[in-house]
Amino acid sequence: MNRIILILLFFIIKVNSQEIAINKDSNNLTLDGNVEFADKNLIEAEKFYRKSISKDSLNIKASYNLANSFYRSELKQEAINQYKSSIEKTKSKETRHKSFHNLGNIYMQNEDYQNAVNSFKNALLNNPTDDETRYNYALAK
């Protein structure tokens, strides 16, 4: 009986340590992407973010940052899709707010005012104190 418990304990520890290693690799790739993004090497940043997401599909920072990279590269449809993905993955009100806010900005640039209004409204639901989002919401209306 003790032997079975030890085997199960060993198995749980092994699986947990592998998961930690994967998360660490994914986070390191995200950090590398952030460096490239800051240096305006958007293609390289995109590569690192994609690698990070491939290691950990629930890495919300990499998903959100990939959307920002697309947005900065003016790949609007890709940015829209990636922001929507980061919204679906996260429970963080801050990330949801920023994603919806940026979606609203893209829709405004595309003159899609109805989607812009909806995006800014959702951003305000996640952060009602943001004056910039409130201003953009009024402008889109």
Report residues per predicted region.
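Feature detects intrinsically disordered, low-complexity acidic/polar segments
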Residues: 70-141
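Residue signature of alpha-solenoid helical repeat architecture, marking inter-repeat boundaries
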Residues: 23-24, 57, 94, 135
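Alpha-helical segment of the N-proximal tetratricopeptide repeat
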Residues: 22-51, 55
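Structural signature of alpha-solenoid helical repeat scaffolds
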Residues: 20-21, 54, 91, 125
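Short, charge-rich amphipathic alpha-helical segments embedded
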Residues: 47-75, 127-130
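Bacterial Sec-dependent N-terminal signal peptides
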Residues: 1-31
